Amino acid sequence: MSGQMFKVEIVTRPANFEKLKQELGKIGVTSLTFSNVHGCGLQKAHTELYRGVKIESNVYERLKIEIVVSKVPVDQVTETAKRVLKTGSPGDGKIFVYEISNTINIRTGEEGPEAL
């Protein structure tokens, strides 16, 4: 197994997902996983209507995007995400970078960067 692998996890507002996906494609990111999540942080509480009752909440909808790269430099992925997602306001999100020790393709049995 050769080649270093990294997982980039981005938690951000869902609004710019399509733009981010497009820009990541331009640098060679061919696949990613995303899921809807909820979170709270520095943003102020907002008022929601729940079953006819107004409630204040500091929980916001977010998107978690997971990308594992080997051939694409991880710095390019993080710089692209920062460029696309930064508004300068609380709630822009966070980027986490992890080293990956192995990847296994269940269907083919390939391991390491070849499994990506």
From Swiss-Prot:
UniProt topology in membrane: Peripheral membrane protein
Pfam families attached to this UniProt entry: P-II
Gene inactivation effect: Cells show no growth phenotype even at acidic pH.
GO term, biological process aspect, one: regulation of nitrogen utilization
Principal location: membrane
Keyword Transcription listed: yes
Assigned keywords, A-Z: Activator, Cell membrane, Membrane, Transcription, Transcription regulation
Gene Ontology CC, one term: cytosol
Task of the protein: Required for full induction of the nrgAB operon under conditions of ammonium limitation.
Assembly behavior: Needs to interact with NrgA in order to localize correctly to the membrane.
Family: Belongs to the P(II) protein family.
Protein name in UniProt: Nitrogen regulatory PII-like protein
Species this protein is from: Bacillus subtilis (strain 168)
